[in-house]
Amino acid sequence: MMRELLRNLIEDKTVINYKKWWMECKDAQETKLLAILCFYDIDDLPEETTAGLDKFVLDKLRVLSLLSLCELSTEVNYQEIKEKCDLKTDGEVEKLLIRAELFVDLKIDSVARRATVLEYKISRDVYSGEKGVPFHTPVRSKINILSALINWRSSLTD
C-alpha cells in the first residue's frame, strides 16, 4: 500500500520532482513508482505497467510527459500531445496544457491546435546513475544530456 506521503506528493499539483524521495525510498514498489515519475513518460512504459497505475498517477504522468515533449520543441501540436500523453480528445489536451502552465508558460492556440512554449519555469528530474531503474535508461539521463551538448558544440564548429 502506498504511504500517505507518496500519495500526497502525487496528488499535489505543484510537485513534479521526485528524485529526492526516490533516492531515500526503501520499499521496492514505491521505488519503482518514484522512478517512473522521475524519469519516464507514459509512452515509455509497458502497457501492463500503465494498466496497473491509478488515476492520480496517470494524471501526473501525463503532465510530466507533456513537459518532456515541451523540452524537445518550442511548438507542439495537439496530435503530438495526444500520442505522447495517451489522450483522446482536444478537450483533454487543453485541460492538460492548462495544468502544465504551473511549470511552463504556454501560448495555446485552439484554432491551430498547437501550443507554443514561451518560458520554462522548471525541468524534470535527470537520471545520473545513482541507483537502478526499472526499465531502459531514461532519455533524460546525465549521459544523454552531455552527449547532446557535445554534439551541439560540434555542430557550431562545423
Curated annotation (Swiss-Prot):
The keyword Cytoplasm applies. It comes from the Eukaryota. InterPro entries: Csn9_fungi (IPR016806). Its main location: cytoplasm. Signal peptide: none annotated. It is found in: Cytoplasm; Nucleus. Keywords: Cytoplasm, Nucleus, Signalosome. Residues 5-119 form the PCI domain. The keyword Cytoplasm applies. Transmembrane segments: none annotated. One of its GO terms (cellular component) is cytoplasm. Component of the COP9 signalosome (CSN) complex that acts as a regulator of the ubiquitin (Ubl) conjugation pathway by mediating the deneddylation of the cullin subunit of SCF-type E3 ubiquitin-protein ligase complexes. The complex is involved in the regulation of the mating pheromone response. Component of a COP9 signalosome-like (CSN) complex. This is COP9 signalosome complex subunit 9. It comes from Kluyveromyces lactis (strain ATCC 8585 / CBS 2359 / DSM 70799 / NBRC 1267 / NRRL Y-1140 / WM37).
